[in-house]
């Protein structure tokens, strides 16, 4: 019952009975909670006389009060809590744990006793000490001494003491990931007294950490071959090599990497072996194992026969700065194929020396890539170029000179030779840093180096598309700075050098060949996709038009660049020197320039800006003169019945390359040339109506048929009225009512003569937007 409830009940029950009932109830309350009130407390005056407070007042010492029914236990604060009565623990619910009774001590109660550390905390500390190599704890030194000593002795000592060791039982990996407290089958030190013979908590934590570390190392180490001296499946197995001491874990860039791998490896199931060893071991070392070792020579054709002859020399390939770390597997399973994941180990960089090779070459460095790490189909022979001449190579009898290309850059450091260029019977000495006795080998599956030595690409994907182009490795044996340097090839003689694709390995041309034209900046008018909508599918280009196709295309404005590079007539080839005037007339269909030539900026196809050309004001043929800004009919096909095109000449100029007389023009579109063709719903054009456009183009003057006239609506109506009068036999008007002005009148050469054929007169009322395919009735 709370204090407020206790206080309110006596007030409600007092009523008219006086003050005796509250006092009696208060007396009963005091019998139950007299412990909570200090004896000798003065009574309050009035009707509260005799009542006492059930809660401690301010500035008064605390006394143990009766515990409440609800309680929250803080396990880490139990040792510093005050003493509790014995009956307090008995009244707690059975589901709550009972706190340990504090031991009586004669010391100062203000100094709290240090609690015992849990096993999980000790396990974590011991594991951190092992991984981080901390020297500040004595348990770490003991663990290192036990690890450095005889493992059998430590196992016997653990077995004698009855403690848990890694040799008795190994917990599962799933238990290891859940928490380090599951490693110990022993109860926690706080749960009960430690039995005799059990290891100390710190000792047990050290053993747990060592077992965890050993299990984590065994996941990354390859499986050992089973001991079998008899023949299995017709093949004899060799006994495993003696154990090597457990390696230390150096720190490189803030990460722990194994410095050496434990156990011997042979076959495809084995992972990367250690970095140290003699030449019989599969992986190289920084120095030769002995000066008296003199391996025998062996041809290249037998390189693939030995199981240990083609080990991957990855320290040589990456200059001692990168290695492949295999993917760790579960204990008891075969190690999977390692991933090509580059790391930075801490093994020393091998200092290589020149090798005595036949033929007096410069420095030869053996580079072998085996099939265990990646499915590579080629083996490389690295030839150092430290002593070679600048911009060349030193010829040697064993390598034909035709298979090598001169190195132009003086900073090049080495060459890679194709396996086809090396004779199969040429012996190679064993390099002092490598374990394999074969410096190079040949592969019949891939003709040439189609893939790089460190690229995870299969042979079937590479194919034989490279054509045996040897590649250049731009690093020497001292080391290489990055993998990006492996992308520079050294092609064969007669082929242009181009950077190789980093994944495919084949050369990719960076610039177009000499036969390919360099892309130029085209104007929007020369885009085939845009022009295809402007021109009808039934229209044909003029026979001599540069903007049309001579292969029977339906649009006259497509493939101009291809037509512009060809002459106007197939029988007359292009020439650089000028031709005589008589032959030029024949080439231009009889049209010759009139007047003095002048330099002028004109529109030229495939040019971003107007170009300066030798220009003329007019051309003439058989007494007919065509000037600039006149409209002409252009041939649209080989037949005379083909409907000609209508264009307005903007410039007449001479081609400086061929001497051909050209013209810049603006096209007029007929109704059938519009997008959608002649549509009565869209407009109701007249018979000779055309639509102006801003479509610029160039063409030869040889395709001009004759001169025509394009009139406005008023001029066309006047022309039709005069033609009707002449048809009816009425005389034409002789005198003008108003004399014409010289400034505003039409020039005489653009005035339509009276005897002009009506088929040569056209009406233009609107402008056609060829880019969007619409008619502009009110152009701006």
Swiss-Prot record:
Biased composition (Pro residues): 94-103, 347-358
InterPro entries noted in UniProt: BAH_dom, BAH_domain-containing, BAH_sf
Biased composition, class Basic and acidic residues, residue ranges: 147-160, 191-201, 216-236
Compartment annotation: Nucleus; Chromosome
Post-translational modification: Ubiquitinated in a FBXO11-dependent manner; leading to degradation.
Amino acid composition bias (Polar residues), ranges on this chain: 544-556
Alphabetical list of CDD domains matching this protein: BAH_BAHCC1
Main subcellular location: nucleus
Modified residues (Phosphothreonine): 588
Biased composition annotated in UniProt, kind: Basic residues: 49-61, 557-588
Coiled coil segments of this chain: none
Residues the record lists as Phosphoserine modifications: 8, 101, 121, 184, 206
Region (Disordered): 1-62, 78-300, 320-358, 514-589, 731-751
Xref: PROSITE patterns: BAH
Signal peptide (from-to): none
Keywords assigned by UniProt, alphabetized: Chromatin regulator, Chromosome, Nucleus, Phosphoprotein, Repressor, Transcription, Transcription regulation, Ubl conjugation
Bias (Low complexity): 120-131, 263-273
A GO cellular component annotation in the UniProt record: chromatin silencing complex
Annotated ranges, domain BAH: 624-779
One biological process term in Gene Ontology: heterochromatin formation
One annotated GO molecular function: transcription cis-regulatory region binding
Domain writeup: The BAH domain is required for localization at H3K27me3.
Subunit composition and interactions: Interacts with CBX5 (HP1 alpha), HDAC5, MBD1 and SP1. Forms a transcription silencing complex with at least CBX3 (HP1 gamma), HDAC1, HDAC2 and TRIM28. Interacts with L.monocytogenes LntA; this interaction, occurring at a late Listeria infection stage, relieves transcription repression, mostly that of interferon-stimulated genes. Interacts with FBXO11.
Biological function: Heterochromatin protein that acts as a transcription repressor and has the ability to promote the formation of large heterochromatic domains. May act by recruiting heterochromatin proteins such as CBX5 (HP1 alpha), HDAC5 and MBD1. Represses IGF2 expression by binding to its CpG-rich P3 promoter and recruiting heterochromatin proteins. At specific stages of Listeria infection, in complex with TRIM28, corepresses interferon-stimulated genes, including IFNL1, IFNL2 and IFNL3.
Protein name per the record: Bromo adjacent homology domain-containing 1 protein
Organism, scientific name: Homo sapiens (Human)
